[in-house]
């Protein structure tokens, strides 16, 4: 039962990361000033 909990937790983390990636892409497309520095770093991360 414990392993099942870890699997669910892992899936939730992956989904959250994917959602973050989508938000980052949208923000970068909008060229939000606050995100400009993060977007520069984000380009080097293969999503």
From Swiss-Prot:
Transmembrane ranges?
6-26
Entry-linked InterPro entries: MgrB
Q: Name one GO cellular component term.
A: plasma membrane
Q: Detail the disulphide connectivity of this chain as listed in its UniProt entry.
A: none
According to its UniProt entry, the protein's GO biological process terms are: negative regulation of phosphorelay signal transduction system
Q: What is its main location?
A: membrane
The superkingdom of the source organism is: Bacteria
**A Pfam family it matches:** MgrB
Q: Where is this gene product found?
A: Cell inner membrane
Sorted keywords for this record are: Cell inner membrane, Cell membrane, Membrane, Transmembrane, Transmembrane helix
Q: How does it sit in the membrane?
A: Single-pass membrane protein
* Family from the record: Belongs to the MgrB family.
Its assembly, as annotated, is: May form homooligomers. Probably interacts with the periplasmic domain of PhoQ.
> Any idea what job this protein has?
PhoP-regulated transcription is redox-sensitive, being activated when the periplasm becomes more reducing. MgrB acts between DsbA/DsbB and PhoP/PhoQ in this pathway. Represses PhoP/PhoQ signaling, possibly by binding to the periplasmic domain of PhoQ, altering its activity and that of downstream effector PhoP.
Protein's name in the database: PhoP/PhoQ regulator MgrB
Its encoding gene is what?
mgrB
């Amino acid at each position: 039962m414990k392993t099942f909990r870890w699997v669910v937790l892992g899936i939730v983390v992956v989904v959250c990361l994917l959602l973050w990636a989508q938000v980052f892409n949208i923000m970068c497309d909008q060229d939000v000033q606050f995100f400009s520095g993060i977007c520069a770093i984000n380009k080097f991360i293969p999503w």
